[in-house]
Amino acid sequence: MSLVYMNIMTAFMVSLAGLLMYRSHLMSSLLCLEGMMLSLFVLATLTILNSHFTLASMMPIILLVFAACEAALGLSLLVMVSNTYGTDYVQNLNLLQC
């Protein structure tokens, strides 16, 4: 395994650890999710470029589309929660409440 792949996997693990440790604020959770998606995008792109597998060349672009949709939904949820409650705490998100 090359050093580049190990660095990308380390970036993914650090983002995952940040998501698990700093989950009190919604903004920090969204930033960790974006870091995970970025490392997955770079890993998928490098893997496809190194293996010359041209049939899967659309997969990183599709992953980028999903990451953009996730970011838009996360930011709209952040705006809604901060306007409603005044803070961006994750504990304010109660899905059982009507």
From Swiss-Prot:
Keyword set includes Transmembrane helix: yes
EC number: 7.1.1.2
Signal peptide positions on this chain: none
Function recorded in the entry: Core subunit of the mitochondrial membrane respiratory chain NADH dehydrogenase (Complex I) which catalyzes electron transfer from NADH through the respiratory chain, using ubiquinone as an electron acceptor. Part of the enzyme membrane arm which is embedded in the lipid bilayer and involved in proton translocation.
Phosphoprotein listed as a keyword: no
Transmembrane segments: 1-21, 29-49, 61-81
Main location as per UniProt: mitochondrion
Catalytically driven reaction(s): a ubiquinone + NADH + 5 H(+)(in) = a ubiquinol + NAD(+) + 4 H(+)(out)
EC top class named in words: translocase
Gene expressing this chain: MT-ND4L
Subcellular location: Mitochondrion inner membrane
Keywords, in A-Z order: Electron transport, Membrane, Mitochondrion, Mitochondrion inner membrane, NAD, Respiratory chain, Translocase, Transmembrane, Transmembrane helix, Transport, Ubiquinone
Subunit structure: Core subunit of respiratory chain NADH dehydrogenase (Complex I) which is composed of 45 different subunits.
UniProt protein name: NADH-ubiquinone oxidoreductase chain 4L
